[in-house]
Swiss-Prot record:
Pfam families: PPR, PPR_1, PPR_2, PPR_3
Organism, scientific name: Zea mays
A GO MF term: identical protein binding
The protein's name in its UniProt record: Pentatricopeptide repeat-containing protein 10, chloroplastic
A single BP term in Gene Ontology: mRNA stabilization
Length: 786
């Protein structure tokens, strides 16, 4: 399209007079930062590099049993000494060379002597040899199983159970069975543990309290087992076995894993009604239930009851309290838990520091978290792999890759070997739009290092691919996970909801939530938050209203900080002012601290609705809360002034940003001021701001020119409007259909219908994708009143 009129742009510094004099002064908008800013090769190099050989751990000295075991004959004592002094790698050959002598001896007595002298590895080797020779009975197996249990060798217990079956008609004692059950639970072999428990009862072995507690723990770790837990508790009481503090904490922890808050409270109250006095472990478990549910008020009530009943909080109590504050957004209160612990003579541990660092990370205060990390090291705590993983995750979210590399180097130098969680953290860091290949490369590196994929890894992969916008790969990982034998958990379903929330596919999201419930899972605050995001993205206002009713009406969903924050954001995306105000008031009424996202959302909605006084009140609240306004805050404030026809005030803020050392305006900032001047009919001022925008190195976008076109059209300056459109096309910026409509509507308001048709003809020649039928019909309707 050719420019018409008196040559609007050649006289302005923002536009070139012609291509022969100089190149275009207005370049295309700069591309988004390349994903290659993530130094993936360097990160993978750190992760795959062999860890420095750790200093050899001091082994427990293995000396001749002292005093000599009276139950052994002199020959047997000599044999035990020979076995225990022989190197493990060649022990099997040594045992074979003494076969006849060993078969004449009492294997169980030899095993007992080895176990009592601390030689459990030699005892295990002897038992395996005896098993192959058919010389191991149930008592021998019991002896070694209990020894392995005391040493925490759960994998060895499981392997021994698989390779050394009991002779027909024999059975272990209840202590040995309980040890095996515990080992199977720790190894994640829950179904095998339950099979063994059923076998134990078939054999007539009466479970002890410890046995029942271990099986309750199995159910808790399995998840979705509340009816079975209740049934087992009834069985315990019927057998005359009363629950103890460990039983209580185990059952409540099971409720915590599945988000069963009501069930946990009912069980706790029933315990008290039966005369049980809760101990600190039980109270701590209940604190964790409320903490993970985001209900910090109930957590504080539990703490008060605990102290009132003379049960002194311990370090775990304050760890849970700090975690509760962290999840509720109270980072300052979480940090104060460290001071409270010190005042009570309690030493914080690595978990305490990790929890407070998480609180800082949740509100984006990474520098404060790093300062606490340094403080932790100065006070003598050696960061473990969990601490490093936590810090790496925070740095990754903020794209502070240089510091990430330094942290990985420090981790390697300290002899802290990256584990599966470290790899999972790297997968999560790569989970950003446009970085799908990075996720795949990290996954390949993980597999090449022999790191086995766990359920957590698959959950991370589903979420990472979802953030990359790859629904196909996300669901592929879900299918691969189930094919590998992993059972989806609530984290898995939430990861799938995260994928769907980015597409607004609320219908599929609802089916996922239904499936969760069918499988026995209770949606948690994250589930509802993601479902709200699905509704918001898909424009399903009725869906948002349904969850609001569960939060404010029936009380089926607890109004945690996460839920209320998401309600503010979801209603904002759907432009539901009433819904936003209700959620915002609930945030304040419940004592939560609104974060900058909540404040900015409220400021923006008030600005868009021209509610000057309320917007100003929100801005003042931001400053009073100690938060620092960001660019979104100032853009919303400029939008408010622009909509109130105070564009000069909006420009003042723009100029302040231009002079700021810490924050610079973006294209939205300039567009907002330009739009304000255009709406006031001050097109020359708008064009002046455009000139300054280009001079400041900010490339205008299609919205910038669309706004200017609208400003000229509203003043019936059609030549100028068409010249702007021509300039856009010349510089590779495609006008929106709405841009063309603004011009046509202005022509029609001016009763210049033929010029409107001529404009459409010119557009159709230069924009081959433009379908002019709808606008032609609009002109006909405007001209003939149809």
């Amino acid at each position: 399209m050719e420019a018409t009129g008196r040559g609007l742009f050649p006289n302005k510094p923002t536009l070139p007079a012609g291509p022969r004099k100089r190149g275009p002064l207005l370049p295309a908008a700069p591309p988004p930062p390349s994903p290659s800013s993530l130094p993936l090769d360097s990160l993978l190099l750190h992760l795959t590099a062999p860890a420095p050989a750790p200093a050899p751990a001091p082994r427990r000295s293995h000396q001749t049993p002292t005093p000599p075991h009276s139950f052994l004959s002199p020959d047997a004592q000599v044999l035990v000494l020979a076995i225990s002094s022989h190197p493990l790698p060649t022990l099997a050959a040594f045992l074979a060379s003494r076969r006849d002598e060993l078969l004449r001896a009492d294997i169980t007595s030899l095993l007992k002597a080895l176990e009592l002298s601390g030689h459990w590895e030699w005892a295990l080797a002897l038992l395996r040899w005896a098993g192959k020779e058919g010389a191991a009975d149930a008592s021998a197996l019991e002896m070694v199983v209990r020894a392995l249990g005391r040493e925490g060798q759960h994998d060895a217990v499981c392997a021994l159970l698989d390779e050394t079956p009991l002779p027909p008609g024999s059975r272990l004692d209840v202590r040995a069975y309980t040890t095996v059950l515990h080992a199977l639970s720790r190894a994640g072999r829950y179904e095998r543990a339950l099979e063994l428990f059923a076998e134990l009862r078939r054999q007539g072995v009466a479970p002890t309290l410890v046995t029942y507690n271990v099986v309750l723990d199995v159910y808790g770790r399995m998840g979705r087992s509340w009816p079975r837990i209740v049934a087992l508790l009834d069985e315990m009481r019927a057998a005359g076995v009363e629950p103890d503090g460990f039983t209580a904490s185990t059952v409540i922890a099971a409720c915590c894993r599945d988000g069963l808050v009501d069930e946990a409270v009912a069980f706790f109250e029933d315990l008290k009604a039966r005369g049980h006095a809760p101990c600190v472990v039980t109270y701590n478990a209940l604190l964790q239930v409320f903490g993970k549910a985001g209900n910090y008020t109930e957590a504080l009530r539990v703490l008060g009851e605990m102290e009132q009943n003379g049960c002194q909080p311990d370090a775990v109590t304050y760890n849970e309290l700090a975690g509760t504050y962290a999840r509720a957004g109270f980072f300052e209160e979480a940090a104060r838990c460290l001071d409270t612990m010190a005042s009570k003579g309690l030493l914080p541990n690595a978990f305490t520091y990790n929890t407070v660092m998480t609180a800082y990370g949740n509100v984006g205060k990474v520098d404060e978290a790093l300062a606490l990390f340094d403080q932790m090291k100065k006070t003598g705590f050696v960061p473990n792999v969990n601490t490093y993983n936590l810090v790496l995750g925070m740095l990754g979210k903020k794209s502070r890759f240089t510091v990430m590399l330094e942290m990985l180097g420090e981790m390697s130098r300290s002899g802290c070997t990256p584990n599966r969680v470290t790899w999972n953290t790297m997968l999560a860091v790569c989970g950003k739009r446009g970085m799908e290949d990075y996720v795949t490369r990290v996954l390949e590196g993980m597999r090449s290092c022999g790191v086995e994929l766990s359920r957590d890894t698959y959950n991370t992969l589903i979420a990472a691919y979802g953030r990359c916008g790859s629904r196909t790969n996300a669901f592929k990982m879900y299918n691969e996970m189930t094919s590998a034998g992993f059972t989806p958990c609530i984290t898995t379903y939430n990861a799938l909801l995260n994928v769907l929330s980015r597409q607004g596919d609320w219908s599929t999201a609802q089916s996922i939530v239904s499936k969760m419930r069918t499988k026995g899972f209770k949606p948690n605050e994250q589930s509802y938050s993601l479902l709200l995001q699905c509704y918001a993205k898909g424009g399903n206002v009725a869906g948002i209203a349904a969850i609001e009713n569960e939060v404010y009406g029936s009380g089926a969903v607890f109004p945690s900080w996460v839920i209320l924050r998401t309600l503010v954001i979801a209603n904002f995306k759907c432009r539901r002012l009433d819904g936003m105000e209700t959620a915002f008031q609930e945030v304040k009424a419940r004592g939560y601290n609104p974060d900058l996202v909540i404040f900015n959302s409220m400021l923006s909605i008030y600005a868009k609705n021209g509610m000057y006084s309320k917007a100003t009140e929100v801005f003042d609240s931001i400053k009073r809360s100690g938060l620092s306004p960001d660019l979104i805050t100032y853009n919303s404030l400029m939008d408010m002034y622009a909509k109130c026809s105070e564009s000069w005030e909006a420009e003042k803020i723009l100029n302040q940003l231009k002079c700021s050392q810490t924050m610079k305006p973006d294209v939205v900032s300039y567009n907002t001021v330009i739009n304000g001047f255009c709406k006031q009919g001050l097109v020359k001022e708008a064009q002046r701001v455009l000139s300054e925008m280009v001079a400041d190195g900010m490339a205008p976008c299609a919205v910038t020119y669309h706004t200017l076109v609208g400003g000229y059209s509203s003043l019936e300056m059609f030549s100028e409007a068409r010249e702007v459109i021509g300039y856009m096309v010349q510089h590779g910026l495609k006008p929106m259909e709405l841009t063309y409509r603004r011009v046509v509507e202005s022509y029609c308001r001016a009763k210049r219908f033929e010029e409107a048709r001529g404009f459409l003809s010119e557009v159709s020649e230069t924009d081959l994708d433009f379908d002019k039928k709808a606008l032609e019909a609009y002109i006909e309707d405007a001209q003939f009143g149809r």
